[in-house]
């Protein structure tokens, strides 16, 4: 397999995402990846439904997706880039840092969230990303995050 083959993935359905990420229901926050540009950028999709468990308490009368789950969706989209770049889906991607997090608008059931992630820097197994979450093209959240790739046998 060539280097290009291990780092390029134009899109990923849920089956491919589950090969890249260890997360499962109810904590898998990315339903689909519609674009991955090598190890530089990706766009992940989350279709928000009222049937998700966090809406039973956040908030029953006016459900709003918790901001921390938007951050998690950003991190998982970034994690898919890291996992695909490494060419070894057996590695773990640990979410390490969050900076400059801002929540601009509420996300509610029925929304389709796009997680736009862009790699800013990579040094060894440490990756830094800028992430935007958008609904209908409008910015709803943003953050700078850091991740670290760890082999499962070292976790």
UniProtKB/Swiss-Prot annotation:
| Record Pfam families | FabA
Q: Name one GO biological process term.
A: lipid A biosynthetic process
* SS bond partners: none
List where the protein spans the membrane. Answer: none
> Could you tell me the keywords of this UniProt record?
Cytoplasm, Lipid A biosynthesis, Lipid biosynthesis, Lipid metabolism, Lyase
Supply the InterPro entries for this chain.
Answer: FabA_FabZ, FabZ, HotDog_dom_sf
Q: Does the keyword S-adenosyl-L-methionine apply?
A: no
GO annotations of cellular component type = cytoplasm; membrane
Q: Where is the active site?
A: 58
For the protein in the UniProt heading, the enzyme class is lyase
The Swiss-Prot or TrEMBL record annotates one GO molecular function as: (3R)-hydroxyacyl-[acyl-carrier-protein] dehydratase activity
Cellular localization per UniProt: Cytoplasm
Q: What is its EC number?
A: 4.2.1.59
**What reaction does this catalyse?**
a (3R)-hydroxyacyl-[ACP] = a (2E)-enoyl-[ACP] + H2O
Asked whether the keyword Nucleus is assigned, the reply is no
Report the function annotation for this chain.
Involved in unsaturated fatty acids biosynthesis. Catalyzes the dehydration of short chain beta-hydroxyacyl-ACPs and long chain saturated and unsaturated beta-hydroxyacyl-ACPs.
Q: Which HAMAP family match?
A: FabZ (MF_00406)
Recorded family membership: Belongs to the thioester dehydratase family. FabZ subfamily.
The protein here is known as 3-hydroxyacyl-[acyl-carrier-protein] dehydratase FabZ
Q: What organism is listed for this UniProt entry? A: Rhizobium etli (strain ATCC 51251 / DSM 11541 / JCM 21823 / NBRC 15573 / CFN 42)
* Gene responsible for this protein: fabZ
């Amino acid at each position: 397999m060539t280097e290009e083959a291990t780092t390029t993935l134009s899109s990923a359905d849920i089956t491919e995402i589950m090969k890249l990420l260890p997360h499962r229901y109810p904590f898998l926050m990315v339903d689909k990846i519609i674009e991955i540009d090598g190890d530089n950028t990706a766009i992940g999709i989350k279709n928000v439904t009222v049937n998700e468990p966090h809406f039973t308490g956040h908030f029953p009368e006016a459900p709003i997706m918790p901001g921390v789950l938007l951050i998690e969706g950003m991190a998982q989209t970034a994690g898919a880039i890291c996992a695909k770049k490494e060419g070894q889906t057996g590695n773990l991607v640990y979410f390490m840092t969050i900076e400059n997090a801002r929540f601009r608008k509420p996300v509610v059931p029925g929304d389709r969230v796009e997680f736009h992630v862009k790699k800013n820097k990579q040094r060894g197994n440490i990756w830094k990303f800028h992430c935007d979450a958008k609904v209908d093209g409008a910015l709803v959240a943003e953050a700078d995050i850091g991740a670290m790739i760890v082999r499962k046998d070292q976790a």
